[in-house]
């Protein structure tokens, strides 16, 4: 009984050590986004609260917490309140299988890749419930758009993950990272380049971020599925969006960029020079690269029309992933490449 209690306490400690830095990072990612996009557009960005605006996320948190939670009279009260939680929980639960470094993982399961795919697919239920429970036509239209978009883009994302499974021969995420040992040119981004590009496009679409943010298109449907939300409930949706951004960036880091592995492996001189750098530092740096790409895409690309988004998925991404999976399977079977 004592051993079980100690194990339970240790698991709770590890969960806290994962979630607290994640939630703090999400808060400051919002500041980083506003600053980066501000510089891209020749603006200053937030600079009033704290030194150079560094306390802005804290002010935003207090602002959202102190706002009144208004529940529309005609809404389905309980579903309305549950919807933000349904969006946030899968984005946090998926971190259970993400390896930050060798042995640094909460649950080292052999079906980690499948678990991640399942968790990233569940968030849409919160959006659907929010659109339905709000009893608003704008919220409902936004929820329907989001559901169709996410379900469609899950197909090429699933095919991209199948390609990773073929290349690695395992669904264990630590095993996938170790399969990429050897340096920058041994990471899966190179032999699986079309699948890497496809995964990233689908990841942006799955998180409803620009330029795929038609689910909350301000110019068409006000604010989409969360138009009726305010205060803490809106904050949960906001948190879920950015938590999903960090999650899909972490997945891309693990399955395509070698996770915690150093990019200087196998390079004489540089490998020993950077041998002191902990694996988690490389992991965070690679993850930050993907987060910056989110900022860049939001600042650069205009919002696509809904029909353009669907056409890109069904007529471009799905055929590309199918063809590349076939080529990949043949390359592995007949040993056409030294990468796999």
Swiss-Prot record:
Protein's recorded name: NADH-quinone oxidoreductase subunit H
Entry-linked PROSITE patterns: COMPLEX1_ND1_1 (PS00667), COMPLEX1_ND1_2 (PS00668)
Known partners and oligomeric status: NDH-1 is composed of 14 different subunits. Subunits NuoA, H, J, K, L, M, N constitute the membrane sector of the complex.
Top-level taxon: Bacteria
MF annotations from Gene Ontology: oxidoreductase activity, acting on NAD(P)H, quinone or similar compound as acceptor; quinone binding
Cellular component annotations (GO), alphabetically ordered: plasma membrane; respiratory chain complex I
Signal peptide: none
Reactions this protein catalyses: a quinone + NADH + 5 H(+)(in) = a quinol + NAD(+) + 4 H(+)(out)
One of the protein's GO biological processes: aerobic respiration
Compartments where found: Cell inner membrane
Keyword Nucleotide-binding: no
Transmembrane segments annotated in the record for this chain: 9-29, 81-101, 113-133, 158-178, 184-204, 221-240, 245-264, 273-293, 316-336
EC class (word): translocase
Family statement drawn from the similarity comment of this UniProt entry: Belongs to the complex I subunit 1 family.
Function: NDH-1 shuttles electrons from NADH, via FMN and iron-sulfur (Fe-S) centers, to quinones in the respiratory chain. The immediate electron acceptor for the enzyme in this species is believed to be ubiquinone. Couples the redox reaction to proton translocation (for every two electrons transferred, four hydrogen ions are translocated across the cytoplasmic membrane), and thus conserves the redox energy in a proton gradient. This subunit may bind ubiquinone.
InterPro entries from the UniProt entry: NADH_UbQ_OxRdtase_su1/FPO, NADH_UbQ_OxRdtase_su1_CS
PANTHER family found in the cross-reference section: NADH DEHYDROGENASE SUBUNIT 1 (PTHR11432), NADH-UBIQUINONE OXIDOREDUCTASE CHAIN 1 (PTHR11432:SF3)
EC number annotated for this UniProt entry: 7.1.1.-
Membrane topology: Multi-pass membrane protein
UniProt keyword annotations, A-Z: Cell inner membrane, Cell membrane, Membrane, NAD, Quinone, Translocase, Transmembrane, Transmembrane helix, Ubiquinone
Keyword check for Signal: no
